[in-house]
């Protein structure tokens, strides 16, 4: 199984945490030191913990489990979507709607509405409406697609979530915790690792770092799919 190399992590800036004044003391075990008032993450620890996370994700993927990738910050949005689609998995890459997991029955109704609107937009229904009516429905379709497009075919709650950024995705993590859904997350030095089953200490802001994590996970799931 491919793991994350120290060299690749250094090149991607995985080791750069936040300014020391913003740190969360609970991240102390994962910090190597300080450079120019910036916390430096211990990449040896990250390598070990990333491998542990990969092993567990591999088990879930091998059982055809559903993994929900969550990355709503700008730096993660496109990579999260690309990774999930490449892996035939699921994603939320815009705003996390409160209750997306804990109020799944209501979310399921919204997904049905999204699918109905998709059909109407393709079967000529929109063309039969006035311009104003069609515009209103098209806006609704776009909004629903942005919010729910990545989970519209999930068919139920995920078997795990992978969050890019523990602080930014704290609502998703809290909902997963309340439902007993395993949480994998990139956790930076300013974040609280509590409630995360598989902590991956690392920079959660740099696009290169985010791409590195997700590319390795994507490759692992692809290999798994080819071998089953």
From Swiss-Prot:
Keywords: Ribonucleoprotein, Ribosomal protein
Molecular function, one GO term: structural constituent of ribosome
One BP annotation, GO: translation
Entry keyword Ribonucleoprotein: yes
GO CC annotations on file: cytosolic small ribosomal subunit
Presence of keyword Ribonucleoprotein: yes
Pfam families for the chain: Ribosomal_S2
Family according to the record: Belongs to the universal ribosomal protein uS2 family.
UniProt protein name: Small ribosomal subunit protein uS2
UniProt organism field: Blochmanniella pennsylvanica (strain BPEN)
Highest classification ranks of the organism: Bacteria, Pseudomonadati, Pseudomonadota, Gammaproteobacteria, Enterobacterales
């Amino acid at each position: 199984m491919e793991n994350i190399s120290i060299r690749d992590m250094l090149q991607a800036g995985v080791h750069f945490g936040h300014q020391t004044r913003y740190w969360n003391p609970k991240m102390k075990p994962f910090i190597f030191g300080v450079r120019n008032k910036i916390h430096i993450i211990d990449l040896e620890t990250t390598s070990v913990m990333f491998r542990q996370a990969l092993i567990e994700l591999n088990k879930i993927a091998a059982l055809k489990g559903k993994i929900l990738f969550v990355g709503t910050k700008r730096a993660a949005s496109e990579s999260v979507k690309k990774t999930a689609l490449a892996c035939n998995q699921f994603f939320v890459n815009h705003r996390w709607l409160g209750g997306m997991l804990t109020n799944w029955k209501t979310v399921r109704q919204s997904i049905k509405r999204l699918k109905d609107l998709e059909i109407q937009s393709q079967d000529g229904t929109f063309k039969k409406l006035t311009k104003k009516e069609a515009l209103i429905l098209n806006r609704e379709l776009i909004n629903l697609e942005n919010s729910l497009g990545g989970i519209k075919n999930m068919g139920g709650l995920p078997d795990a979530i992978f969050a890019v950024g523990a602080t930014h995705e704290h609502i998703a993590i809290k909902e997963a915790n309340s439902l007993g859904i395993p949480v994998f997350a990139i956790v930076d030095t300013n974040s609280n690792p509590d409630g995360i089953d598989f902590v991956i200490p690392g920079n959660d802001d740099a696009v290169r770092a985010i791409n590195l994590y997700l590319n390795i996970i994507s490759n692992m799931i692809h290999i798994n799919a080819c071998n089953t």
